[in-house]
Each structure stands twice: as structure tokens, then as C-alpha cells.
């Protein structure tokens, strides 16, 4: 599916969520993935995934590295590990830290009418 589709599915399943903002710079990528993105190498399903979600994305193409945008549509993601925490739930992050479980905060909840803003 890709990260963007997993994120959109979370929006659809939770009526109390209005929208999301994802920061491309905060998405952890392996060095090999960065090389592939910089060389415009993408998976065979990348375009189909992009086309299925593009109407739900708000992207300012002048402010992002458009090559890195493809990481949102690559089906080789662990979308099952994508979750949304209320800002008051710091104790969950503290527990992850305590157990030395790596995580990355890649965005936030917004009021963007079931859209995902990519920054």
C-alpha cells in the first residue's frame, strides 16, 4: 500500500481524525532507499499507489524534495506499525524509550478535511 495509503486508512477508520500532516524529512529511510529515491528508482506498484491516494494529498511541490515523495507510495513499508497518539500520551513514548524501541514521530493531526498534508 505505501505509507500514504496506510495513513489515509487511519483517517477513514477514525471519524474523530480530521486530517494529517506528514513531514518527509522525518521519515526514517535506509541509505539504500535514499540512493534509490535520488536515482528515481521506484517499485513497480509506486505509480498505482500514488494514483489511488493523490486526491487525498495536499503537497506544496516547491517546498519538498519531490524525489523523496515516492517513499510515501512504496509498498515495502511497515504500515502496520503506523499509529497516532494523542499529544497527552507521552507515557507511551516514554515506555518505548524505556524498552529501547525505535520510533519516529513523522507528523501530526490537523484539520485538513480527511486529507494528508505533506511538508
Where on the chain are the PLM-derived regions?
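Glycine-/charge-enriched secondary-structure boundary and capping motifs
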Residues: 1-119
Amino acid at each position: 500500500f505505501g505509507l500514504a495509503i496506510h495513513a489515509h486508512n487511519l483517517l477513514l477508520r477514525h471519524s474523530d481524525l480530521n486530517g494529517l500532516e506528514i513531514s518527509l524529512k522525518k521519515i526514517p529511510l535506509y541509505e539504500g532507499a535514499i540512493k534509490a529515491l535520488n536515482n528515481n528508482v521506484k517499485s513497480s506498484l509506486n505509480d498505482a499507489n500514488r494514483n489511488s491516494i493523490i486526491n487525498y494529498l495536499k503537497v506544496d511541490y516547491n517546498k519538498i524534495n519531490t524525489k523523496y515523495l515516492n517513499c510515501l507510495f512504496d509498498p515495502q513499508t511497515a504500515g502496520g506499525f503506523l499509529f497516532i497518539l494523542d499529544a497527552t500520551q507521552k507515557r507511551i513514548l516514554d515506555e518505548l524509550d524505556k524498552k529501547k524501541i525505535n520510533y519516529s514521530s513523522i507528523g501530526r493531526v490537523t484539520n485538513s478535511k480527511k486529507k494528508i498534508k505533506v511538508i
